[in-house]
Structures are given as structure tokens and as C-alpha cells.
């Protein structure tokens, strides 16, 4: 697959040959979905907690005698049916993470990249660098490229000036190539790869 390379100013800067094994697959939504669920489950803190009947601070003394009152038989006041009692089957601190084989995660990333390429949402930049770290300048460049919602992937290191200028622009994310992931690819309309990112991805998936 051949794709033209553009500059930040919107000018053509040649073309690049993309591997069909990475960008030319027929996207499988089931594999992509499994990876997204895995990512979102893993990022949950799992710190929610409610006290059960053994943990609430309240007397455990029997409320009243067993017989002779005409009332229902009750023991501890910590039981869930009373106000101030413990919660029945409440949330506890736990990990929400699920297992997903590494091969499936790698395959899902390939399918996500292929989905962007097939849908026309993939752009290749020659480089993501700015002479002066000015957000206003970068907004103008993005407007010319039609980038309202985009994930920008650079090489192993992101240019500090570019990252600083893009930081306050809504719906724009900038990541190094080692941070690329399925969820962030899908949540933005466009995927922008620099030539360095393309080379790194093809070396990674060899």
C-alpha cells in the first residue's frame, strides 16, 4: 500500500510504502473489541468499597427478647435490612483486569491500524516538529490538514516543542511510537504517523 507523505504545512513530501501485513488487513471488529475491553478493564482502579455487616460499627447485642413482644425475631442490628446496617453483596477492593494473550493484543493493533487505513483516516507526516512551540501556529497547521480529532504518533521520542504546543488543543493526543494502543487509535477520527513512527512499527512487527 502506497500513501503520500505530507508536511505540517500541507505540502507533499513524497510517498511511503506501507506493509500490507500491518496496514492492509481486513479489520476484524471482534478482535479489536476484545483488546479495548482488556484496556479499559485494566485501567480501572478497583478501589470502590462498601462495609458489610461484619465491618460496620454498631452493637451486636440482640435487639429485644426472642419471645413475648409480638415483633419479628431479630438479633444483630448490623444486618442489611436495618438503617445503618452493613451492605449486602457490596463492592469490594479488587482488580478488574482480565487476561488477553499477547498475540491477540498484537493482532488487534494491526487490525486497528488497518481499519484506519481502509477508512481513509490515516495520514503520514514527514516529521512532527516546530521551530517555535506556539499553539496558535500548530492549530493553523492542523486546520489546514483537517485535523479536528487526531492521535499523532511520533518516533521513539516526541519533539518537546511540538508536544508542548499540542498539549492545550482539545481532541489532539501526541504519543511516542511505543505508546501506541488500540483504544487511543479508535477514540480519535484521524491517525497521524510520522515517517519515523512508520519505520518503527514495521520494525516492531517484523
Curated annotation (Swiss-Prot):
Function: One of the primary rRNA binding proteins, this protein initially binds near the 5'-end of the 23S rRNA. It is important during the early stages of 50S assembly. It makes multiple contacts with different domains of the 23S rRNA in the assembled 50S subunit and ribosome.
InterPro entries, alphabetized: Ribosomal_uL4, Ribosomal_uL4-like, Ribosomal_uL4_dom_sf
GO MF annotation, one: rRNA binding
Keywords: Ribonucleoprotein, Ribosomal protein, RNA-binding, rRNA-binding
Protein name: Large ribosomal subunit protein uL4
Entry-linked Pfam families: Ribosomal_L4
Assembly description: Part of the 50S ribosomal subunit.
Any single biological process term in GO: translation
Organism name: Rhodopseudomonas palustris (strain TIE-1)
GO CC entries: ribonucleoprotein complex; ribosome
Family: Belongs to the universal ribosomal protein uL4 family.
Amino acid at each position: 500500500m502506497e500513501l503520500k507523505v505530507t508536511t505540517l504545512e500541507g505540502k507533499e513530501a513524497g510517498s511511503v510504502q506501507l506493509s500490507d501485513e500491518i496496514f492492509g488487513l481486513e479489520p476484524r471488529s471482534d478482535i479489536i473489541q476484545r483488546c479495548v475491553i482488556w484496556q479499559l478493564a485494566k485501567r480501572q482502579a478497583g478501589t470502590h468499597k462498601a462495609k458489610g455487616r461484619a465491618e460496620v460499627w454498631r452493637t451486636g447485642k440482640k435487639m429485644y427478647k426472642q419471645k413475648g413482644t409480638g415483633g419479628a425475631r431479630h438479633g444483630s442490628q448490623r444486618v442489611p435490612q436495618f438503617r445503618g446496617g452493613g451492605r449486602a453483596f457490596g463492592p469490594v477492593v479488587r482488580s478488574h483486569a482480565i487476561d488477553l494473550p499477547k498475540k491477540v493484543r498484537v493482532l488487534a493493533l494491526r487490525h486497528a491500524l488497518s481499519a484506519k487505513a481502509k477508512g481513509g483516516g490515516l495520514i503520514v507526516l514527514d516529521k512532527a516538529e516546530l521551530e517555535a512551540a506556539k499553539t496558535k501556529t500548530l492549530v493553523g497547521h492542523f486546520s489546514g490538514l483537517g485535523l479536528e480529532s487526531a492521535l499523532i504518533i511520533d518516533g521513539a521520542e516526541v519533539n518537546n516543542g511540538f508536544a508542548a504546543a499540542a498539549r492545550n488543543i482539545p481532541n489532539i493526543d501526541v504519543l511516542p511510537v511505543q505508546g501506541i494502543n488500540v483504544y487511543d487509535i479508535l477514540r480519535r477520527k484521524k491517525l497521524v504517523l510520522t515517517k519515523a513512527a512508520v519505520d518503527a512499527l514495521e520494525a516492531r512487527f517484523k
